[in-house]
Amino acid sequence: MINDILAPGLRVVFCGINPGKSSAHTGFHFAHPGNRFWKVIHQAGFTDKLLKPEEEQHLLDTRCGITMLVERPTVQANEVNLHELRSGGRELVKKIEDYQPAALAILGKQAYEQAFSQRGAQWGKQRITIGMTQVWVLPNPSGLNRATLDKLVEAYRELDEALVVRGR
């Protein structure tokens, strides 16, 4: 079981699609050695030091959190079905309404579109909000994503800078 890293008043909650097998085995988010999440959020400015998956609780010190759309582990995120994503989207809305972070960053455009019945989403800030929480769509940091590290960092940094401008 992989636990959410959540608390009231966070700057951002990063929402992965679902845990991979490495994460399910270790019990930590983004645990596969090829996953670039920890490197990306550090280089984008969310953390002062490069955290390891087993240090995930330290994210709360930086007012960041993690959750996921679907709890079922798979080898690849494309193994998650539409029903699971829609159900996960409804549960995610409840969590975000409870915790009200400044931003929710969903890590994957297709997962966002399916979970929230949206079409034609663009990267970055979305038009919808959950209460006062801005919704962002960022590229998934999985090693299976073809985006370069620099492109990932650039996308995540845009969110970090927007939060700084908002005083968060």
Swiss-Prot record:
The keyword DNA repair applies. It catalyses: Specifically hydrolyzes mismatched double-stranded DNA and polynucleotides, releasing free uracil. Its main location: cytoplasm. Keywords: Cytoplasm, DNA damage, DNA excision, DNA repair, DNA-binding, Hydrolase. Its EC number is 3.2.2.28. It is found in: Cytoplasm. The keyword Ribosomal protein does not apply. Signal peptide: none annotated. This is G/U mismatch-specific DNA glycosylase.
